[in-house]
Amino acid sequence: MFWVVIPAYNTEDYIRETIDSVIGQTIGFEEHIMLYLIDDGSTDGTFNCLREYKNKYPDNVVIKHFENNHGVSAARNTAISEIRQKKDATVLFLDSDDLLKEDAIWQAAQFFEKEPEVNIASLKILYFDAKEGEHRLNWKFEKCQVVDIKENYNYPQFYIGGVFLRRSALQAIEFDERMNFWEDALAINRCILGEGRYGLIRDGIYYYRKRPDESSLVDRAWTDKERYTTFLDRGYRALMSYSRRKYHRVIPYVQFLVAYHLRLFLWKSKGELISELLTEDEMKKFRKNLKKVLRPIKPKIISEIPTSVPVLEMIMSIKQGKKVRARRTYTENDCIFSFRGTELARMSERKVRIYGTLSEREGFEGMWHGIFATPVFQMAEADYIFMEHEGTRMIPERYPCRRKLYILGEKVRNYRFAAFAFWKPDDWDEFQFGIHTNGIDIMLNHVVFEDGKWNWEGEKEKNSEF
């Protein structure tokens, strides 16, 4: 029997659609599914919605009601403590505003039949509502069906929504009720460490709602000061401690998972928020605690994280307590950025952008304005951008630029030499940009002038958080 656990708090606008996606499962709701619905002290009509389904399906619906809000962890623990007593129970966690594809549970049943030794398995996640598309970790589902965390240490699992647990994993799962974010990642990864593996249900889909008002727990968590204080101990370091108890060390899977998630703190959008939330002293303490978290994570693991060069440099700088920069290797016509033997980026793949004509800057009126402000590179005063068209080279004028890049309040890039202005020759409807640096010329992207605007070609910034 599949038990679908849905904690709900003030989600009357979504909960019916969520429950209906379970009732409509092709495997057969009344024959194979039990709904465990928890109203966590809602102040809207959520509890009344749950009672409607209990009245309609009395043999397939269990409801619990808390007078006061206890938090999602307490709600899940309440359900688990009862369900784990049931024979042959398999639990699926579903958030009260998310949905299941109609064959999701059937796909899970097929998976467990083929993989009888696996006790944890996850559905693929697709976003819907305010944002559509695939979760950035969905690539895992195309690579393998069962993740052995010793071999596939770079296959992290963070979310609990869409995850099935049974047998020993169901007995082991427990959520830290002191936490109101990342409690799911901590709980599921303790189980994964215990099992040593987890499954990927390639054709099963979990629809994750991104609300237009960003009111979900995940969205709100970044504005909670606790995320930058106690969370580092209760989340990251707690998982590391569990790894030490289980394996006598922080295994590569945990190292990669923590470093992969920690990089989010260093993204531009998060950095600006952190700077507003934390005082100067709190920021210093936060960085000090980040260093403690990073201590057991090997540089090789960090170098494998899919992130931008400045984020990786900042992670290593915090870890080592000194400024660390990616290695630059110059060839005849390129510059390769790498760290610990892992190639991160190539200069030739970066883009120069043209933003339009200038109207207010004296001496530059009517000229086109461009900038080469890639996160991987900061131009020096001796560097310059050039343009080439059918063997003719033109060097544009340098234009004042105040753009800078900050991470956790620290300036990591200064683009004062990155901007330029130029007049477009009448017969230059297309040309290629290049940069002269370190005594060599590196060709960059090709641009085309069409219908009064510029279109540029070239690779998008990989893992660009800026």
Where are these regions (language model features)?
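Short, well-formed alpha-helical segments that are part of the catalytic scaffolds
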Residues: 11-25
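Cell-envelope/extracellular polymer assembly enzymes that use nucleotide-activated donors
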Residues: 1-3, 34, 186
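A conserved acidic beta->alpha catalytic loop
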Residues: 39-48, 68
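Short beta-strand-to-loop acidic/aromatic patch adjacent to the donor-nucleotide binding site
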Residues: 87-99
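Glycine-rich, basic loop-to-helix element that forms the pyrophosphate-binding segment
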Residues: 66-86
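Non-catalytic N-terminal targeting/anchoring module and adjacent flexible stem/linker
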Residues: 1, 52, 248-249, 253-466
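Conserved nucleotide-sugar donor-binding catalytic segment
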Residues: 147-237, 241-252, 258-261, 265-266
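Conserved donor NDP-sugar-binding/catalytic core segment of glycosyltransferases
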Residues: 99, 103-137
